[in-house]
Amino acid sequence: MKRITTFGDSIMGGIVLDQQNGQSAPRYTLLEESFSSRCASALGVEIKNHGRFGSTTRHGLRELDRWREQVTASDFVVTEFGGNDCDHCWKQIASDPEGEHRPIISLAHFKEQYRQMITTIRQLGSRPVMLSLPPIIADRYFDAFTRSMNSEQRGNVLRWLDNSVENITQWHEMYNLQLFKLSALLDVPIIDITTPFLVERNYREMFCDDGIHPNERGHRLIADTICHAATGYI
């Protein structure tokens, strides 16, 4: 049986928004039928999943070091990072909309830290495989992270976004594009899980209300995409 170790953020970890939660603060839960679980069953492989809520490439480097022996024993290591790296500290923007604000992990550091992860995986004797990022639903995400803000703070964030919540996607798209560039530069296979969403007319229905986490339907789509692509690797 092939062994696969995965590292990434909450999407890799199978975290979804608890849609039954009636509280103002969002609560998250682990999806039993996540794409990782579905892939393990469909492909007949063992998957050790180290996806973590809020993880960036900086965390990924630490996790790789922590699980070195497991990586060495794995046939493949699958990585999925970028969604948190490209995010912003929206509370700071709400307090100072005229200030200079950058993504949590700069694009330069994102590129370098991802490159270091790939190098480490190879040095430990495993084969890296990258995942691209699912798209985001900008208006839902804006509503989610401004829910606890007052009207002035919400207005400040919107003003910083040049009065268009769709501008949130520009960083996400930029970091996602960088993944494909890194794949080509480092000669690492990448599985495109972006396009399968975008070709669906109703892909918004495949995301939780927070606009960033795929729901069960979304995880099913990701699993189908990976399993189809994996026939070339496994």
Model regions and ranges:
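Structural motif
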Residues: 55-64
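Secondary-structure junction/capping motif
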Residues: 19-38, 56, 106, 132, ...
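Short N-terminal helix/helix-N-cap motif within the alpha/beta-hydrolase-1
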Residues: 15-16, 58, 88
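Serine-esterase "nucleophile elbow" of acetyl-processing enzymes
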Residues: 1-51, 65-73, 77
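Alpha-helical cap/lid subdomain in secreted, periplasmic
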Residues: 63-234
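Intrinsically disordered/low-complexity terminal segments and short unstructured peptides
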Residues: 4-5, 55, 119, 224
